[in-house]
From Swiss-Prot:
Pathway: Protein modification; protein ubiquitination. The modification Phosphoserine is found at residue 108. It is found in: Mitochondrion; Cytoplasm. GO terms for cellular component: Cul2-RING ubiquitin ligase complex; mitochondrion; ubiquitin ligase complex. Coiled coil: none annotated. This is Protein fem-1 homolog A. Component of a CRL2 E3 ubiquitin-protein ligase complex, also named ECS (Elongin BC-CUL2/5-SOCS-box protein) complex, composed of CUL2, Elongin BC (ELOB and ELOC), RBX1 and substrate-specific adapter FEM1A. Interacts with PTGER4. Interacts with NFKB1; the interaction is direct. Keywords: ANK repeat, Cytoplasm, Mitochondrion, Phosphoprotein, Repeat, TPR repeat, Ubl conjugation pathway. PANTHER family: ANKYRIN REPEAT CONTAINING (PTHR24173), ANKYRIN REPEAT DOMAIN-CONTAINING PROTEIN 16 (PTHR24173:SF74). Belongs to the fem-1 family. GO terms for molecular function: EP4 subtype prostaglandin E2 receptor binding; ubiquitin-like ligase-substrate adaptor activity.
Length: 653
């Protein structure tokens, strides 16, 4: 163990005497080095503050000159928080004595992490009321500094259910109607977490019932998350804009005027909504029933809520009609929503139809752009797959994928997850078919080809974005999944017309000239073993000669270069794949092309393996190649003296 790590570990474990022994007598430069960041990104002061070692903290600051503002990486609840100052770590862990000490020594009370989280927000997150009181009351911590998502201290207190912290923040003038980047308010956070008492507290402070960026009211948010207590409370008949406090609820009086009912919403305007209208109550109960079906798996509970919704629809002789769908959906087995009490009661004998009703209701109320809509369609498909009904699963997943591609941004994590699920499912079904023969589940060319086309479309959409996605891990993963789908497609028999369609689709992909990590083309990725790892379950195995041949047949450039000037031949050599190397060479790959380190592919082959003996480089090296390498090796000037095509040829070597 080196000295730097020993200092860090001593600070982490609170071993002051050992720390003093390690650091005493050191020069200022040595102390600065030893109290700086370790390999994991943390510092001794940061880790000591995180674990509440007051004596170590004060020693490092007072005697060793450690900076109270230096940020670093620290672990909390299984996550790595980057750029966290020591005060943030102490506040998050609830170490009030360390918080006091750091502030006395000049720490900034509003210093943020990389995600713009303040020490106050950290204390609010885990419910450290005394730390919150000290930061706000003694050091005037800013209540309104939001994190990168626009989420404030009041919002996180409400979401985590810390009632006394929420009450204190409101007393100090926290803005009760502040909006996050996605338009949600503290009321939404209460509804999503089921904190009825805090929700009542917010309403007592004139919190407004408004829609977020997805069009969700707090009432609908409670329905989606299945918090019946919130739904029941909000659908009670209470006049909109009622200024009277709720029975038994002490109204909090904010010290400032920022949460007054006249406070205008900041930024984008959102529609205010009345939570107690008949239509809102009906939709909330219907959506709550859908949540009972898919999330709580309680069909009888769902029927109870749907009955109440149906009664409200017919209340007073004025029927509230449901909008007619433009067309019935194959994925939903052409189901349509029930409209009468008799149709509703008949559902009790048909659980599968109840599950389709839940999907229909969710899509109608939340709309196709809400993440829950496609999520539960995929969830229902997965349940069918688990029971062996792969055909029904594929239909639902295709419908969800279309919904995601039409409504979400390119390379959305949800869309990527759908593509990966398809690849894993197709791999499983093909293996099942291989093992069971005709008894296995059949999977057709159309199923695989349809998803491959959608995958190529996703890459095309991503490349149309203003920002270049080439360095994005998500983009690399999308390319890898497409290659896995192509790998699986090679295992399915197809007609000449289908083969032509497959080649057209691959040509579309190559025409986009997509680049993954390190500038890898699809051909580079097809010869790289790392492409195998795309998810939890195995799909295809790479390097893959079959995929390489398809890519080459469709026009992939065998001499394309990555950021290190490696050709696919170099990557194939690093993976010791002589069969693939021969295929690349036959397609015109230059055997003696060098990379940025002046290595040819042949030189990268492992000497210990037979691969090197199966490749004969001199069979593919021309006199022109040798002359080009001689020019480069001897640094003979050639630019401007020979044709441009020859200059490019020499640079290849």
């Amino acid at each position: 163990m080196d000295l730097h790590t020993a200092v860090y570990n001593a600070a982490r474990d609170g071993k002051l005497q050992l720390l003093q022994k390690l650091l005493s007598g050191r020069s200022r430069e040595e102390l600065e080095e030893l109290t700086g960041e370790v390999a994991s990104g943390g510092t001794p002061l940061l880790i000591a503050a995180r674990y509440g070692h007051l004596d170590v903290v004060e020693y490092l600051v007072d005697r060793c000159g450690a900076s109270v503002e230096a940020g670093g990486s620290v672990h909390f609840d299984g996550e790595i928080i980057e750029g966290a100052p020591p005060l943030w770590a102490a506040s998050a862990a609830g170490h009030l004595d360390v918080v006091r000490s750091l502030l006395r020594r000049g720490a900034s009370v509003n210093r943020t992490t990389r995600t713009n989280s303040t020490p106050l927000r950290a204390a609010c997150f885990d419910g450290h009321l005394e730390v919150v009181r000290y930061l706000v009351g003694e050091h005037q911590a800013d209540l309104e500094v939001a994190n990168r998502h626009g989420h404030t201290c009041l919002m996180i207190s409400c979401y985590k259910g810390h009632r006394e912290i929420a009450r204190y923040l409101l007393e100090q003038g926290a803005q009760v109607n502040r909006r996050s980047a996605k338009g949600n308010t503290a009321l939404h956070d209460c509804a999503e977490s089921g904190s009825l008492e805090i929700l009542q507290l917010l309403l007592g402070c004139n919190a407004r019932m408004e829609r977020d960026g997805y069009g969700m009211t707090p009432l609908l948010a409670a329905s989606v998350t299945g918090h019946t207590n919130i739904v029941e409370y909000l659908i009670q008949e209470q006049p909109a804009g009622d200024e009277q406090a709720q029975p038994g609820l002490a109204r909090v009086q904010p010290q400032g005027a920022r949460s007054s009912p006249e406070e205008p919403p900041s930024g984008e305007s959102y529609e205010s909504c009345c939570p107690t209208s008949r239509e809102a109550a009906v939709e909330a109960l219907e959506l709550l029933g859908a949540t009972y079906v898919d999330k709580k798996r309680d069909l009888l509970g769902a029927l109870k809520h749907w009955r109440r919704a149906m009664e409200l629809r017919h209340q007073g002789g004025e029927y509230l009609p449901k909008p007619e769908p433009p067309q019935l959906v194959l994925a939903y087995d052409y189901s349509r929503e029930v409209n009468t009490t008799e149709e509703l009661e008949a559902l009790i004998t048909d659980p599968d139809e109840m599950r389709m009703q839940a999907l229909l209701i969710r899509e109608r109320i939340l709309g196709p752009s809400h993440p829950d809509t496609s999520y539960y369609i995929r969830y229902r498909g997965a349940v069918y797959a688990d029971s062996g009904n792969f055909e029904r699963c594929i239909r639902l997943w295709k419908y969800a994928l279309d919904m995601q591609q039409n409504n979400l941004e390119p390379l959305s994590p949800m869309t990527a997850s759908s593509f990966l699920s398809f690849a894993e499912l197709f791999s499983y079904v093909l293996q099942d078919r291989s093992a069971k023969g005709s008894l296995g589940t059949p999977i057709g060319f159309a199923d695989l080809m349809g998803v491959l086309c959608k995958g190529v479309r996703e890459v095309e959409r991503a490349l149309q974005l203003p920002k270049e996605p080439g360095d994005s891990a998500q983009f690399t993963k999308a390319l890898a999944i497409i290659l896995h789908l192509l790998y699986l497609l090679e295992k399915v028999e197809c007609t000449p017309d289908q083969e032509h369609l497959k080649h057209q689709t691959v040509y579309r992909l190559l025409k986009c000239a997509p680049r993954g990590k390190n500038g890898f083309t699809p051909l580079h990725m097809a010869v790289d073993a790392e492409t195998t790892n795309v998810g939890r379950y195995p799909v295809g195995r790479f390097p893959s000669l079959q995929v390489v041949k398809v890519l080459l047949d469709c026009g992939a450039d065998p001499d394309s270069r990555d950021f290190d000037n490696n050709t696919p031949l170099h990557i194939a050599a690093q993976n010791n794949c002589p069969g693939i190397m021969n295929a690349l060479i036959e397609a015109g790959a230059h055997m003696d092309a060098t990379n940025a380190f002046k290595k040819t592919a042949y030189e990268l082959l492992d000497e210990k393996l037979l691969a090197k003996s199966t490749i004969q480089p001199f069979n593919y090296v021309t006199l022109q190649c040798l002359a080009a390498r001689a020019l480069d090796k001897n640094k003979i000037p050639y630019k401007g003296f020979i044709p441009e095509e020859l200059e490019a040829f020499i640079e290849l070597h």
